[in-house]
């Protein structure tokens, strides 16, 4: 009847909304099934101790040094190893964060330099890049193109200086 008693205790310790006991703690559950009254008291103490430790971890480890020391004696290598791994991951994430921040700032500076160079330059290559790259909406680009087509019906050479001027005006207005 010891087998059914331990199964009953396993079900008795399971609380609604909580996952079942991990395999590492199920061994404690089966070893405490010796006496009915003594086993339950021992399990209650273990459960209370586990709850206190879990509460301390949730609060950030403040207070309750006695229960914390008892919990650390049971599994120090695993907890210490987990904390060391967590620290390493946090340091790595901080380094990655700083690296990405530096790259973002460098990209921002490059964009500002490019915008300044394109505003200063009067070549058609820069105008082409501005027309194709810096319009917020396709509608703005199409409206500007249809206005230019409606105003002048000459050769493409006649329209290119006007396109450059309208693009420069658009850039100056947007800044």
From Swiss-Prot:
<protein>
    <recommendedName>
        <fullName>Protein FAM89A</fullName>
    </recommendedName>
</protein>
<feature type="compositionally biased region" description="Polar residues">
    <location>
        <begin position="157"/>
        <end position="169"/>
    </location>
</feature>
<feature type="region of interest" description="Disordered">
    <location>
        <begin position="141"/>
        <end position="175"/>
    </location>
</feature>
<comment type="similarity">
    <text>Belongs to the FAM89 family.</text>
</comment>
């Amino acid at each position: 009847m010891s087998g059914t008693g331990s199964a009953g205790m396993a079900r008795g310790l399971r609380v609604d909304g909580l996952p079942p006991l991990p395999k590492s703690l199920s061994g404690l559950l089966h070893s405490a099934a010796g006496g009915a009254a003594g086993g339950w008291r021992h399990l209650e103490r273990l459960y209370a101790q586990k709850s206190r430790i879990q509460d301390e971890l949730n609060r950030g480890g403040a207070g309750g040094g006695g229960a914390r020391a008892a919990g650390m004696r049971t599994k120090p290598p695993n907890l210490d190893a987990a904390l060391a791994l967590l620290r390493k991951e946090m340091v790595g994430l901080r380094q990655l964060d700083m690296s990405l921040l530096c790259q973002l700032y460098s990209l921002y500076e490059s964009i500002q330099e490019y915008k300044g160079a394109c505003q200063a330059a009067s070549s058609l290559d820069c105008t082409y890049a501005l027309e194709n790259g810096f319009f917020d909406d396709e509608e703005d680009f199409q409206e500007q193109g249809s206005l230019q087509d409606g105003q002048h019906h000459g050769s493409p050479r006649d329209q290119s200086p006007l396109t450059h001027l309208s693009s420069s005006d658009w850039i100056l207005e947007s800044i």
